[in-house]
Amino acid sequence: MPDTTARILALRAAGTSLVVELAEPVPRVLHWGADLGDLPESALAALALTGEPAVLNNSIDIPRRFTVWPTEADGWSGTPAHQGHLAGASTAPRLSLAGTSYQAQDEGGELSLRLTEPGAGLDVTVTYRLEPSGVLAVQSRITRHEDADPAPYDLAQVATLLPLPRRAQEILDFTGKWSRERSPQRRPLGFGTYARQVRRGKPGLDSPYLVTVGVPGFGFAAGEVWGVHIAWSGDQQYLVEQLPEGAGAHAAVLGGGELLRVGEIRLAPGESYTTPVCHFAWSGQGLDGLAERFHTLLRDRPNHPRSPRPVILNSWEAVYFDHDLDRLLRLADKAAEVGVERFVLDDGWFRGRRSDNAGLGDWTVDPVVWPEGLTPLVDHVRSLGMEFGLWVEPEMVNLDSDLAREHPDWVLGSSRGAGPSSRNQYVLDLANPQAWDYLLEALNAVVDKYGIGYLKWDHNRELHEAVHGPGDRPVAHAQVLALYRLIDALKERHPGLEIESCASGGGRVDLGILARTDRVWASDCIDPVERQSIQRWTTQLLPPELMGAHVGSATSHTTDRVTSDTFRLITALFGHAGIEQDLTRCTPEELARLTAWTALHRELRPLLHGGRTVRADLGGDATLLHGVVSQDRTSAVYCWARVATSPEGQYGRVPLPGLAAEATYQVRVRTELGLPSLHQTSGPGWLAPALDGWLTLPGAVLTIAGLPMPNLNPEQALLLEVRRTEGASGA
């Protein structure tokens, strides 16, 4: 990309913009947020002039500027862009601009800034790439000069930071646990630092996921919001920071990066460290607007799944470790009968794996359980017209395995002995080249022998004491990079191989792993009450086609809650759909309902996996309305769900978000999956005609005024379909 002589540079796309001034010694961010338009040089100069803050009492004697790489040299007292030292020295970096490359496009572009720090012998390159979706991808690279002091530079922290305005005063992020991932939490932004640190070796079940700051009371449909997601599958940190003196002309900062373990990154001359990509996005239309940006970003990727997402049956909740060929053949027969398109054999197929106490690491088919190998099952599944997939957990190892007995040094952990196990397992040291080579060849052999087209890739134990080698050197960073290389190498050998990211359910859901996998398992919990919330918030970052959403048996295997098949089936429609139950024990009525469900999913799949996700602001958690609207707003499907009781009798009119107010639509209730139980004597006036067929209504009535919704009993759902009538305008 060419260098530029301009002093103020802008990137613009999809209603958002970034403006940077090439100030000396370090450039500063003048604006990130709503698009300022195609500003002439005079207007850009005015933006720079008005971006100069006041000099405060009892403060430094020059205006504080918030730079692209904030340090104490700028008078910045907040979290610095980086911290490190040379044997306890060179701890106060002073950077200066050494080069710029800039390429603006009609929608987006890229700005790269090279900074130099002679004291520690560092070059820092910060690259801003504004995608056509309006998502701003920021990545930095720190390199030691070839002729630098031979002592290693210990890099302790790198944080990517962008400014926030004063009106951004409320924080939304996430927490969770096993079977309850991505639980939202809100708090006001006060003075100081709000930091979320993850030290699990993966984002974790309590992952911050997507940290959003917005105007007070922002919701799904309204309110200005700014968000960041760190595309990294290991330790990470997010922060929102507001100092009394502000951040230059701005009020606060938002950002984060990889959380580096002490002594993990030591740069010798010529060596580099590259940060994960931090994805920033702004929306003036609330959380749905923010989600749309990320969904567009992901769908625009060259490696985004293009073929229809096949309906899956996963064997885990059907048979667990009881791998019996005849039983699995019968299960496959039933799966094909109800319309399943991909059959996945879960945990229990490999050597010594009769429980979770043993076998992990020995990735060959158990000859006792499978005397003829997997071939009889694989061939039968394919003869029924289904694809065949397999569960693996390559990064984990049981001490009761041939692999651990033969190579105890391949187990990641302290030289003073293994720490506590998790589900009876430990982590394999992927930074060990021999262990990495073994895994690649073992996985390749299984995939190659059986023509496996799909792997469910699990990961359970956290990376506690992620050290190896003499002196117990930290390798959490190297472990993630080795994982990425392993998946990339396996996919290179097997073009078309699809991989699902699973980590005790939804413990590794990030755009780093999704750069090389094809979907995520949102949670081990498929109880529809829990899944309504889990899926609602997983789609804040991911489009539905990347999120596994399965229907299970009436009694949930994780909560023991009993729910209706109608509620379970409607909930599982809104993702990459699948089944987790023993179909050989289903009644004919249950099988008929599942058959109708798979047919309905195939009918709605182009809409569900290509439309815009919308969610209604209802002011409480007892009832939920969410849906998917086609990009041209000609069709939509909505779920109206009640997950708990509430004092409300009438809900008032509930707008169906995303439709064109000026158009005319038809509405009907889809009844193939059954009808919900109602907590009322009779339904609202529109419900009966919508149950009988298509009811024609103006778009303004549907999306502005709204429909009075039926009062459902708890743990019930209603499915609405909407289509625009011929000849109606309103694109």
Region annotations inferred by a language model:
Residues 15, 210, 222, 618-661:
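Carbohydrate-binding surface patches
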Residues 306-441, 454:
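Aromatic-lined carbohydrate-binding/catalytic grooves of carbohydrate-active enzymes
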Residues 15, 140, 270, 313, ...:
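Conserved, mostly hydrophobic/aromatic
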Residues 645-731:
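C-terminal beta-sandwich/jelly-roll accessory domains of carbohydrate-active enzymes
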Residues 63-96, 220-236, 280-303, 340-347, ...:
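Glycine-rich, aromatic-flanked loop segments that form ligand/cofactor-binding clefts
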Residues 383, 398-437, 480-584:
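Glycan-recognition surfaces
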